[in-house]
Regions:
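Inhibitory N-terminal propeptides of secreted protease zymogens
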Residues: 19-142
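Protease zymogen maturation seam
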Residues: 112-182, 194-198
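Subtilisin-like serine protease catalytic core
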Residues: 159, 169-269, 283-286, 299-300, ...
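C-terminal subdomain of the subtilisin-like protease fold in secreted/lumenal serine endopeptidases
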Residues: 160, 283-289, 422-477, 482, ...
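Substrate-binding/access-modulating region of protease and related hydrolase catalytic domains
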Residues: 172, 179, 239-242, 256-350, ...
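Extracellular S/T/G-rich loop segment that most often corresponds to the catalytic His/Ser-adjacent loop
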Residues: 187, 349-422, 426, 459
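Surface-exposed, proline-anchored Ser/Thr-rich loop/turn motifs
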Residues: 468-493, 503-510, 533, 552-556
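C-terminal tail/sorting-segment detector
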Residues: 512, 529, 533-556
């Protein structure tokens, strides 16, 4: 999605007085001397969940975790006449809103801030709100409503293929739907969400734990501004009855953090992202989804270059790494610039120690729009991929929409990982990253288009969970198109094939085929045109055991 807005923190600072338009300014402090907070009492600024995460990953609490000295903050406000937008403990900084000042007063206020003994520098991070008139650039295709009134024979409806590509239905069948897992969503807004029945279960079950507006903290309203976040959230948790739709993690707990201004692209959105990341850490969230990105801005002097995509220039990228180092799994969209002159990933997906998610189509083929790696310092990007082209999600009036973008592939991974976290609690987030990449189709031969490939989350669980049966040394790599009206293609890996069976959802055998000699090719093609509409199990039999996948039969 281009939301993939882009912000940059250059290593070369520009003077705040170089831009005279009133707006928002980032103020860097020199130290935390005299702070009322102490490392001896972290309960004052970290929740019990956050403290437990630090113990799990053996991460010490350091001075970087101490909140900004409130005396410094108040001194900036008193000297400038501005209002507080955010503070950042990790950067030891604050963002001050000076948009109400005229130009002459602004120059005087900036001079006063710069003269404070504990201020290192001041940087312009956004223009005044009244100057924000540029339309937001969204990294998605135009939404297309789908006429779909007939119920499905599975709970997933049109979402089945995009979930099955990751083996998420198998996690659900085993009882893992994200229950008890805490998921943060950083996005542009959740317009229309309040009126959509797809989120009834989320509200009624009390799993919408927190909403926070980092764009307009003085007049918060996350249910305004844009509906991109609504789509992202729907991919994870939406539920419509009669088998019309089910998201990737329909039982997880969700925290909605609005970090994007729908009308503009300025670096202040990185300030918002950093503030959201620090709150996610303080709350002890398990995983966050950021279907956002930063590279170019409405003010071209703020633009990044590809050389900046090294994880250490963008403040959002730095914060993403620090959040990960504090035990939170960070999932970021790679970007949708694959067909543009800038075809690389965007911040914060260039960060170290995070999952950067690319996009494929429904058959697992690389989507051309998906941004490429590597990071500018040569690290593998993207990390993994899944369906982001023509993904399905609920929209207004209980209709089903369809759109494309890495904004849509990332939440499928986030939701799937939430289900896995329910299955294996208290696992180091870096270990999760190792496991999911090792369980992907290109684990042994990653590239800069699909990274390690498409993960099989069920196989990942079986491989790493004591007490679950191990998979044999083969798997059905892909079964497509799914749904199908006539022809079914099956790609296999591993052991020679002895035969196959198709049965209905009750287990009743409908058709089977056995080979006189082992089938050593990894491709099968079946004609299923005579099957009635419905859900079926395809079972592959090899010299080492059986493997089963679900497919849907549609009418012509």
């Amino acid at each position: 999605m281009r939301i993939l807005s882009f912000v940059i923190l250059s290593l070369i600072s520009w003077a705040a007085t170089a831009q005279n338009a009133p707006g928002f300014y980032w103020v860097q402090f020199s130290d935390k001397n005299g702070t009322p907070y102490s490392l001896d009492y972290p309960q004052a600024f970290l929740s019990e969940r956050a403290l437990q995460k630090r113990q799990l990953i053996h991460k010490e609490i350091t001075e970087q975790d101490l909140p900004v000295n409130p005396t410094y903050v108040q001194a900036v406000l008193d000297s400038s006449g501005g209002s507080l937008h955010h503070t950042s403990k990790w950067f030891n900084s604050m963002t001050v809103n000076l948009s109400s000042l005229d130009s002459a007063t602004l120059e005087l206020s900036l001079a006063k801030i710069n003269n404070l003994p504990f201020v290192v520098e001041v940087k312009n991070t956004a223009a005044s709100n009244k100057e924000l008139a540029v339309e937001k650039r969204m990294n998605t295709d135009t939404e297309t409503a789908v006429d779909w009134s007939e119920p499905s024979s599975t709970p997933y409806g049109k979402a089945f293929n995009q979930l099955d590509l990751l083996s998420i239905p198998r996690l659900h069948e085993a009882g893992f739907k994200g229950k008890g897992v805490h998921v943060g969503v950083f996005d542009v807004g959740w317009m229309f969400m309040s009126a959509m029945h797809a989120f009834d279960a989320l509200r009624e079950e009390g799993r919408l734990v927190m909403v926070r507006d980092f764009v307009n903290p003085l007049q918060p309203d996350v249910f305004d501004g844009g509906d991109h976040g609504t789509t992202v959230l729907a991919l994870m948790t939406a539920e419509l009855d009669s088998g019309r739709y089910l998201g990737a993690a329909p039982e997880a707990n969700y925290y909605l953090f609005q970090t994007e201004n729908v009308s503009s692209e300025y670096r202040i959105e990185e300030d918002n992202w950093v503030a959201a990341a620090e709150l996610a850490d303080s709350l002890g969230l398990d995983v966050i989804n950021s279907s956002l990105g930063y590279s170019t801005f409405d003010d071209s002097t703020m633009n990044y270059t590809y050389a900046d995509m090294n994880g250490h220039v963008s403040r959002a990228s730095q914060a993403a790494q620090w959040l990960s180092e504090r035990g939170v799994l960070v999932v970021c969209s790679a970007g949708n610039s694959g067909t543009y002159p800038w075809y690389y990933i965007h911040a914060p997906s260039d960060a170290e120690k995070i999952l950067c998610i690319g996009a494929t189509d429904s058959l697992g083929v690389d989507a051309t729009f998906s941004s490429h790696g590597p990071s500018s310092d040569g690290r593998m990007k993207p990390s993994i991929t899944c369906q982001g082209r023509r993904t399905y999600y609920p929209i207004q009036q209980d209709a089903i929409g369809r759109g494309s973008g890495t904004s849509f592939s990332a939440p499928l991974i986030t939701g799937g990982m939430a289900c896995a976290m329910q299955a294996i609690p208290n696992v180091d987030n870096q270990l999760w990253m190792e496991w999911v990449q090792a369980a992907s189709t290109q684990a042994d031969n990653p590239d800069y288009h699909m990274g390690h490939g498409i993960p099989d989350l069920w196989w990942m669980l079986q491989k790493n969970t004591p007490g679950l049966d191990k998979l044999p040394n083969f798997q059905i790599q892909s079964i497509y198109p799914n749904p199908t009206s006539s022809q079914l293609n099956v790609i296999t890996t591993g052991a020679p094939v002895l035969g196959w069976q198709v049965s209905d959802i009750t287990g009743r055998l409908l058709v089977s085929c056995y080979f006189d000699q082992s089938w050593t090719r990894n491709y099968l093609q079946l004609d299923v045109s005579d099957l009635p509409q419905g859900s079926y199990h395809f079972t592959l039999m090899t010299t080492e055991g059986k493997s089963t996948s679900i497919f849907l039969k549609d009418l012509e």
